[in-house]
Amino acid sequence: MSNPESAKKQVDPPGYNELFMVRDTRNVDLERGLELCKPEKVNKQNLFTNIIKPQKDKINIKTDKIKFFLNNLFTEFSKFHDSCYPDGRISTRSKLRWPLLIIWCILIVFAIDKNFEVKDFLSIWINESFINENRFYSEIWGPIAIYICLFILLLLGLICMFPLHLCRVCVLALRETGMIIAVLGAALGMIIAALGATITGLLYFSHWALYKVVILALDLKIEPFKDEIAFLTLPTHNGETLSIRDNNQS
């Protein structure tokens, strides 16, 4: 004689709950998922085409964008330097160099954000890190804080004065700890003095770089000398205007 329970199990379709006779979709979906995960069921070509290749193309686009940006930066900088400062001399008597540096830093922060979407990326990260109740405040103050941090980091990095003052403080602290450390501090002070002799050059090189990045951000092109119109009112690092036509006549 056949067992009634075994006969019932044979009659009931798979995927149905025996007690309530409702379809158990969880087991069916699990079985399908396991079936699709088998190595012979995975289409590697579709996986590469739909997932891996788009991500790789996106990374390549970002890399090419950065390379193009840097290439244009140094190309335009070379044209500007060779045309306006053929002998390499730069005036250091300008009192506007610090305001100009701050203004250029502000402009370059927006230029970097425009080209590489720094603010949007960091804003998403900040918004996801905050609790839902604080999301309104993070959307307002998040971009402001990002811009301020970018400006401070850029200003400190380009001025190159912050490491100098920090080293001087370290030297003063070392000189008070003993004779041996005082000798090391004196040696470090000599190195700092040597670096201080070149700080003006570093400062004005940062002026050049900032000026050229702003030109690139505003889509301004520096043409050769044959195009005098582009150079009629070219601003210099002294806050003046350089007239190529007057310069050629003189």
UniProtKB/Swiss-Prot annotation:
Q: Where in the cell is it found?
A: Cytoplasm; Endoplasmic reticulum; Golgi apparatus; Membrane
Extract the coiled-coil ranges from the record: none
Name the UniProt record assigns to this protein:
UPF0494 membrane protein PB2B2.07c
UniProt KW tRNA-binding keyword? no
Primary location: cytoplasm
Q: List where the protein spans the membrane.
A: 98-118, 144-164, 179-199
Look up and give the membrane topology term.
Multi-pass membrane protein
Species of provenance: Schizosaccharomyces pombe (strain 972 / ATCC 24843) (Fission yeast)
Gene Ontology terms: cellular component: cytoplasm; endoplasmic reticulum; Golgi apparatus; membrane
- One matching Pfam family, short form? DUF999
State the InterPro entries in the record: DUF999
Which keywords does UniProt give here?
Cytoplasm, Endoplasmic reticulum, Golgi apparatus, Membrane, Transmembrane, Transmembrane helix
Source organism superkingdom: Eukaryota
Q: Which family does it belong to?
A: Belongs to the UPF0494 family.
